[in-house]
Amino acid sequence: RAFFAPAAPRRRPEKHAKGSDTMELFRCPVCGAPLTRGARVLVCPKRHSFDLAAEGYAHLLPAAQMHAKIPGDSREMVAARRRFLDTGGYACFSDGLNALVCSLLMELPAPSLVDAGCGEGYYTARLVQALRASGKTPSAAAFDISKFAVKVAARRDKAHAVQWAVASSFAIPVADAAADCLVDIFSPAAAQEFARVVKPGGAFVFAVPGPRHLYGLKEVLYERPYENTVQDVAYPGFALEQRIPVHSMLTVTGSTILDLFAMTPYYWKTPRSGAERLASLDTLTTELHFDFLVYRRAHA
């Protein structure tokens, strides 16, 4: 009588996370070593491993750097900002950023770009698209402390043009002197880390609200509206080269008014009476005033 061994069970093919084919700009957040990409994981030579989500982003925020159970913007805040930005309400700002960075990187055919505090990726994606349209082949890494924001960014990046990660600006998982240009859009400036990451002679573009930004919104929210403080900060290792203002007017209607409100810091510090006045409006017109602060990294 012949005996046959049972057939080996079929193994399901290993699923690979979506996203950029390489993660060459990111480094291990524990030891700083290069990361090798597997199917659903990034691993460094010291065997520190980090999950790759199905959408293609990496989770490079160690537990020791998480100062809250769920750090960063909530799912609701991210959704409100995404809806508002999709209306084109801040397109003038995005277009200005694109023109500025393209001019700063004019002489580099393959520049490296880092977006610190990228949110849901609206500005990053449009900036990379503009660089490509100008004939460049950029390498771009973008990160935010909010996993909800990064998840949206990676999911919408159908071309896998950007390396996305959940990470902190105060412990950036990027190698020293890796970025030709670093952009920070309305996020806290981690000057020491930015100086480490930007190449000597490279650029740091810091986008901040100008004095009259969203003043029309404040006139509804507050009995005594106030102008924003002018930011003109000196950062060690950088020299401020220029301040470039962007002015426009914005009219929003319906639910977009509340989406705009929800993506601002005023959402957390407005009295109920002000929020109720805003909710009663059908139309809101307000000034937009952004400033781009362009810093140059000192040469070694």
Give the predicted meaning of each segment.
Residues A179-E193, V208:
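A short SAM/SAH-binding and catalytic strip from SAM-dependent methyltransferases
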Residues A191-A203:
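A short glycine-rich, Lys/Arg-flanked "PGG" loop and its adjoining helix->strand segment in the class I
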Residues H67, G72-G96:
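Class I SAM-dependent methyltransferase Rossmann-like catalytic core
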Residues S112-D115, E120-A171:
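Class I SAM-dependent methyltransferase SAM/SAH-binding core
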Residues D21-I70:
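N-terminal auxiliary segments of SAM/dcSAM-dependent transferases
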Residues G201-P211:
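Conserved beta-strand signature within the Rossmann-like core of class I S-adenosyl-L-methionine
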Residues V246-A300:
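Conserved Class I S-adenosyl-L-methionine
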Residues F170-C181:
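A short acidic, Gly/Pro-enriched loop at the edge of an enzyme's catalytic core
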